[in-house]
Structure formats: C-alpha cells, structure tokens
Amino acid sequence: MNIADGRQAFPAPAKLNLDLRITGRREDGYHNIESIFCLIDLQDTVYLKPRDDGKIILHNPVGGIPQEADLSYRAASLLQKYARNLAGVEIWLDKKIPTGAGLGGGSSDAATVLLVLNRWWQCGLTQWQLIDLGAALGADVPFFIFGKNAFASGIGKKLIGMDIPKQWYVIVKPPVHVSTAKIFTYEGLTRDSASSIMPTFQNLQPFRNDMQAVVFKEYPEVWKAYSELSKYGSAMMTGSGACIFAAFQARNSAYNIYRQVSGLYEAYLAEGLSKHPLLSV
C-alpha cells in the first residue's frame, strides 16, 4: 500500500512455537533447538520509503532502543553492502505484536525489511542467502524469511516446510517481560531432548516447550496466565515467553474463550496462516 508521502506498507506477521525442544548446547554457547513454527495473522506493519543518499533512518525506535540496536535498522545496514547503488531507506514501525512476548515481532520486522530491500536495492540475494544473513540478527529471523510454516532445527537455520491444520489461537500476555538470556543460562533448563526422527505435525504430538517449566518457576505471572487459559483448552507457552496460547479448531470456540480471558489479560485472537503475506505481494 502506498502512502501519500511516498511510504509503502508491508506486513510482518507474528509466530507461535507449537512445539519447542532443546536438543543440546553448542561449543559456541548457543543451543540447538527443534521447533514447529506457525505464522499467525497478528502482525506489525513496516513502512518503507527509499532514499538515494545511502542513509538509513528509523523514525520510531521501539521501547527506547537506540536506532543502531533495532533489528529493523540492523537488517537494512547488513543488506546495504550488497546494494548496487547508493541505496538508503526510511523505516517506520506500526507495532501490533507485543514485545518480549515470544511472538517474534522484532525478528519479523527485520525479515520484512530484508525481503523488501533485497528487491528494491537489486541485491540479488537468494532466499537462503537472506536466511544466512538474517541468522546474524536472531534465531527467529530465518523462519520469517523462509515464509511458511516449518520445522526448524539447529540454531533455527535448518528449515523444512510443514503442513499445519487450520486453527485459531487465543493468546494471553501476562504483565511481565521474560529475559531469554536468563532462561537459556538457567542451570535446571532441559538441554537434552531427543531429536525427532520423522518430524511431522502428528508425530511430534503431544507438544511441549522445554523452557516452560523454568519460566513458570522464575516468573509466577506466566504460570498464572497458563493456569487461567488451561481452564479452556490445552495451553502452552510460545518461545521463551511470556505469552501463553491455546489452539481451537473453530473460530467461534476461540472467540468465546478470547472474550473470557480478555478481561483478565492483554489478549489476542489470531488465525493461523499457511504462508507469509509477502509471498502474495
């Protein structure tokens, strides 16, 4: 969508981890994971306006983060060296995905910047080259560049497309910010889950999140949200938290539960997607 001042609008959808297992710790300190990533229609909007002077300007950094530390700014900076001309861009973020929630909002914004600017700046990078570039920004960025529901392994760069049944999700966000670094360094964190031999949606059930027990112990508010949503369905934490979600087959069922919990928590009703909206642009 074009705006009167020359900006163009691009979607940046959120994700849920329907299953998340930690299969080991690497020599570099990072962890190997296996996870089912699912796109949902809760999304930010990234507004971009091209410049021809090489400047990258982020007009509204999120949460007081310095411009140079924002993932969207860093994404443009990383890609700029591949541009054919003196390429620049102005960036605005319309945030609808809550931060510190395990929904991948910042990573999705960065992926959208990479996908669009790769075309605008005529960088010519393939999808897998963009995935390698995005991995330097964060473990969730490769999935959003991949652009469809997937089984991810390793540090998030190994991606296999996965068919996920159409579902609706009720998501609640407790009033707390979970430190991902704190959870990954927790001594009692499960780090030895067995790797999946045949990773299909059916074979991986029952789903679980290896970080959930530690987060519940360290952040009681997340446990309370889980307990509340569990009254209505099979609830689970996404990512390292803090959001809790439950899946439903019918929109009406999900909507009724959403109404129940929205008076207690910041809550969202979201539909699962099969592919990134940018794949249709």
UniProtKB/Swiss-Prot annotation:
The gene is ispE. One of its GO terms (molecular function) is ATP binding. It comes from the Bacteria. Catalyzes the phosphorylation of the position 2 hydroxy group of 4-diphosphocytidyl-2C-methyl-D-erythritol. It holds the Pfam family GHMP_kinases_N. ATP binds at residues 98-108. Belongs to the GHMP kinase family. IspE subfamily. NCBIfam families: ispE. Coiled coil: none annotated. This is 4-diphosphocytidyl-2-C-methyl-D-erythritol kinase. The active site is at 15, 140. It catalyses: 4-CDP-2-C-methyl-D-erythritol + ATP = 4-CDP-2-C-methyl-D-erythritol 2-phosphate + ADP + H(+). GO terms for biological process: isopentenyl diphosphate biosynthetic process, methylerythritol 4-phosphate pathway; terpenoid biosynthetic process. SUPFAM superfamilies: GHMP Kinase, C-terminal domain, Ribosomal protein S5 domain 2-like.
